[in-house]
């Protein structure tokens, strides 16, 4: 199914919230500072909707510029939340996320002509990556559409019942973090701004890694 067909099906079923179309001729439409453009299927979506969110804001696809779901270039800025991860966010261009902070991303390299269109998911605790789709169109059709209909993660379903719909600028995070030994109980989940949540997750990862290194 094409990007157009997939988006139309999602809209017909009321499964996503869209934004006005992006200007894909603007400099902000570039993939990264190296100048690699977005894959054509990804650019096509943004030319129809400048990002989107699904399942009440629990799954997000970023856009470009200030009127998007979230501006990819600002989100990927090295001086932002990525700095807290001590290099673990390097080599990735983040294009979306779940409400828990799991990031969807492309792997990036030095040569923009050798671009890998595979979409990866990086978990919010360690930024460990796994491929979820060979291209953006498949990501939209499979990963996003499936979760927009019925998320496979029961905790996400329970969280929506507890917290309701979320703004795309907000993430849910466990306090204390699961990595630091926190309980996987929704009573310990709070809403934070996405940048603050990802920074705290990076700080937690570094602290746990430092303890592990010291006791090795």
List where the protein language model places each region.
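Compact, glycine/acidic-enriched structural inserts
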Residues: 115-152
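Short aromatic loop motif centered on NTY/YTY
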Residues: 144-172
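A surface-exposed partner-binding patch
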Residues: 1-106, 110-111, 161, 165-216
